[in-house]
A protein has these predicted regions:
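A conserved acidic beta->alpha catalytic loop
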Residues: 32, 40-49, 89
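Conserved nucleotide-sugar donor-binding catalytic segment
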Residues: 8, 132-222
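Short beta-strand/loop segment that forms part of the nucleotide-sugar
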Residues: 24, 33-42, 62-65
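Conserved donor NDP-sugar-binding/catalytic core segment of glycosyltransferases
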Residues: 93, 97-129
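Short aromatic/hydrophobic "clamp" motif used to bind/position activated sugar donors
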Residues: 85
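Glycine-rich, basic loop-to-helix element that forms the pyrophosphate-binding segment
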Residues: 64-80, 101
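Acidic helix N-cap motif at the loop->helix transition within catalytic regions
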Residues: 17-20, 45-53, 97
Length: 261
């Protein structure tokens, strides 16, 4: 694989406040061969006008009603023609070298199907909150709920998507975890330690804040689908989070507002 084309999909819905940062972080990559696709869910906050400002540099985009984030991502990858796939949400942003380093890794490691790096955590205004260091994982660890893969910093081979895709439309919160499990089941995956590839924005409307409990319910469903035991670590984590969930959400929200004040 020489100079592969990288297809990046951004699902967008009413996040105009962050969208230009997301778009420019893709367009300003040091790697030149990028096919950028944006799928907007009929936003009414000015997002479409922002997309139009960059449309000459976007391979394909659409703004129409959809069934949510998962549907938008699937729709985007239906249009993708690249050798390597990734998606970047409309409130996150890449670091300039991310795609180039991922491509080089794939060239040097033809047996690996998914590679991921680290991310910085940022707040609503883009101020740094710290760093999330991923960890090496595999199919068995993923099934036990040890995810450790930041979606913003993950890239995978397009030919594997053809085997395991699309994303499950029933998954609204843990569609990325579901994809990692399916990819890890058929291909080696690798953590590229020490390489920060993206900024993960934590804000009041992000799913990390608002829907952590729903994400774990999705993960439990995936675990059971793949034959997981009711006595596994993942199930224990699910029930612990369910019991302490109200306090945990209050604590996260309190700390989130401490960060932005």
């Amino acid at each position: 694989m020489t100079d592969p084309l990288v297809s990046i999909v951004t699902p967008s819905f009413n996040q105009a406040e962050f969208l230009a940062e997301t778009i420019t972080s893709v367009l300003n990559q040091s790697y030149p061969r990028i096919e950028y696709i944006i799928v907007d869910g009929s936003s009414n906050d000015g997002s479409v006008e922002i997309i139009k400002q960059y449309q000459d540099q976007i391979a394909w985009w659409v703004s129409e009603k959809d069934q949510g984030q998962t549907d938008a991502i699937n729709k985007g990858f239906q249009q993708a023609t690249g050798d390597i796939f990734a998606w970047l949400n409309s409130d996150d942003r890449y670091h300039p070298q991310a795609v180039s380093e991922a491509v080089q890794f794939f060239i040097e490691n033809p047996d690996v199907g998914l590679v991921y790096g680290d991310v910085n955590l940022i707040n609503h205004q883009g101020k740094g909150l710290g760093q999330f260091n991923a960890k090496e994982t595999n199919y068995q660890k993923l099934r036990r709920g040890r995810v450790h893969i930041p979606q913003q910093a993950a890239f995978w081979r397009a030919d594997l998507w053809k085997e395991v895709g699309p994303l499950d439309p029933a998954m609204f919160f843990a569609m990325d975890y579901d994809l990692w499990v399916r990819l890890a089941k058929i291909s080696p995956i690798h953590y590229y330690a020490g390489h920060i590839w993206a900024d993960f924005r934590i804000h009041g409307q992000s799913k990390t804040i608002t829907a952590d409990d729903k994400c774990w319910a999705d993960m439990l469903q995936i675990h059971r689908r793949d034959g997981g035991s009711w006595f596994s670590i993942l199930v224990a984590k699910y029930w612990i989070r369910k019991m302490i969930g109200p306090f945990w959400r209050w604590y996260k929200n309190r700390n989130y507002f401490d960060f932005i004040l």
